[in-house]
């Protein structure tokens, strides 16, 4: 039984390494969309006193979330993954993820959350604007989109974890996923 477990563990390690190599290879080809759900921010949804201009009224990254963001950035820099742009939701937890992972980013309202009833009416316009932006994007490298669960769920039909990256092509075909 111990021998079998050792073989099983060895297999799992090599599968993980192969998938990491596969992800690096995909990203080095360029022209990929990299959706990132914001890193760990305790709680769920948005507080009632939410103000987009005041981070103290929002969920923010925990210490673990900051480390998770830095690990995402480290993965990109250590593997020399080229990026055209990093776009982020205007929510502080997304901006914090982008800041700790990549340093430079631009905010785009089409990446904002529409989870709470307060923002649900924005959903169709945001998804339309997001798809239009991606359709018009012609970069040679990769496009990073730091956003929320609901946006990724709507566009890719994927249930992402906090700090997970989902790689797709411009037609929103999911090619790979990686947790950090």
What are these regions (language model features)?
Residues 2-11:
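Sec-dependent N-terminal signal peptides
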Residues 3, 28-29, 138-139:
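Short hydrophobic "helix-edge" motifs at membrane interfaces and signal-peptide entry regions
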Residues 11-17:
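Short, intrinsically disordered, charge-balanced linker/junction segments flanking boundaries
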Residues 12, 110-120, 127, 131-134:
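All-alpha RGS (Regulator of G-protein Signaling) helical domain and cognate RGS-like helical scaffolds
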Residues 18-109, 114-118, 158-180:
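Active-site-proximal alpha-helix that buttresses catalytic centers in soluble enzyme cores
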Residues 35-37, 41, 126-135:
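Short, contiguous, well-ordered secondary-structure segments
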Residues 64-68, 122-129:
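Soluble or luminal CAZymes and related metallo-dependent hydrolases
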Residues 131-179:
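Active-site-adjacent alpha-helix immediately C-terminal to a catalytic or transition-state-stabilizing loop
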